[in-house]
Every structure is written in structure tokens, then in C-alpha cells.
Amino acid sequence: MMKLTHAGIAFALATFAVSATGCGDASGGVSPNKGRAYIVGIDISGSRTKTDLDESRKLLDDLIDRLEPGDRLTLIEVYQGGRQPARQWSDSIRTPRNGELTGSDRRRVDDFKSVARVQTSILFDSVRAKEIQSTDIFGTLARAADYAEASRNRPTTLLLLSDMINETPSVNMISKGIPGDSWIRHLSAEKRIPQLRGVCVVVAGADVSSARGAAIREFWDKYFEAAGTHVSPDNYRNMISDPAEIAC
């Protein structure tokens, strides 16, 4: 039987998952109360600078380095429009049956991280960034809520690598302004706000210094409250350098 190298495994799996979700566990089942689930929304829209994107990618790479058996990682492109749907990828690392890592388990973890880094490269594609027509944070949150619901009782963290400026025809925070409280109440009454109760939300990439940035932050504070969660001031940041700070 042919033995694949780590790079070969990464390339083969990443090629398969370029535009689809790797829905299965990386190596079989996972114990329901083991590990954490990380859901990452990746915004590469034109409103973000190269420095912003480089910082976001480094943070995600560092987070991948910290993943352990039992953890699940989900990557979602913050995007709407164009001929292609938003890209996404999700997979997890199996928890060792006896709780102790074998050499095979360690290789499995390394292979998972290699695939995750390839997926990160795909989602931070600079050519793809030029095709993005709108930034759909609301759609990303709805998809993230679906993944959080299916996280199999893992503690779940939603990391948004974004400036948090929504740009869709219905809500364009640049050209049409920021929706008011009545808009949030209307959506909440119609049960159109995705529920993220119990999910730790962390934002890295937001404008935290200007008046407009403060207004956008105030909007999201109220929106996340309606979604059943809360973003603490320490977790709504322009930049996070240490992945250990991705926590509540």
C-alpha cells in the first residue's frame, strides 16, 4: 500500500475541499465533550488593507498551531455576490480513544494542521479579493450559528477577522449608514437574527479609534445581544497578536 507524505495528504485533501466543506472528522468520530470548536469568519474585502490581512492571517496561522486533538476548525469566507458562492471548510481532529497521543495521533494532528494552512491560503487569496462584490457579515453569522449548533457540545469560539463593515444591497454601512435600534428589534421580532447563545465572540480587525468605528461597534454590541451573546470590550479589537487571547 502506498504511503503518502504529509505534504501529499495536505495537497490531496485541500484540492478536494477547495470550494466545499470538509464535513467529516479528520480521522473518524469525536468524543462529544472533548476539545473546542473554532469558527473563523475571514474578511478579505477591499475595505481592509494589506497590513490588516497580513495580521489576520498570522493570527489564524498561530491559532492553527495551537489546535489539539478533539478541536474542530471551521473557516468561512465573509462574502456575498459574484458567480461563486462563499467558500468554507470545516473539519476536526479525532480525540485519542485512550486519551494518550500515539505517534500516529501526532502525525494525524500535523496532517490536519497542514490541510488547515492550505485552506487558509485559499481563503486569503489576493486574486479572489478583487472579485468580492460585497461583505456579508450577517450571512456569515447565520452560517456560523449553524456550525455552532452542530459543534457537538464543544465550547465554541467565533473569531471574526473583519473590520465589521457590512456591505450588501440591503445593509451598506458605507453608503447607507448604520441601521438603528428599531431595525434590530424588527429582525428580532421576526426571529431573523441567528442565535449564538453560549458562543464566545472575538473580533480582530475592527476600527476602534474613529467616531464611525465607535458607531459600528455600538451597533454590533446591540446585534450580538439580540443574538444571545456578548462581545466584551477586550474582545472587540483592531489587532490581536497572541492567539491565547482568543477566548472569553
Describe the residue ranges of each PLM region.
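Sec-dependent bacterial lipoprotein signal peptides
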Residues: 1-21
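Bacterial signal peptide processing site
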Residues: 22-26
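Von Willebrand factor
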Residues: 34-154, 157-159
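Acidic/histidine-rich, surface-exposed loop or edge segments in extracytoplasmic proteins
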Residues: 34-47, 121-127, 201-205
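P/S/T/G-enriched low-complexity
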Residues: 36, 199, 203-248
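Extracytoplasmic/secreted cell-surface and envelope-processing proteins
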Residues: 48-52, 83-87, 167-171, 211-214, ...
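VWA/integrin I-like adhesion module and closely mimicked acidic/polar interface patches used
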Residues: 165-218
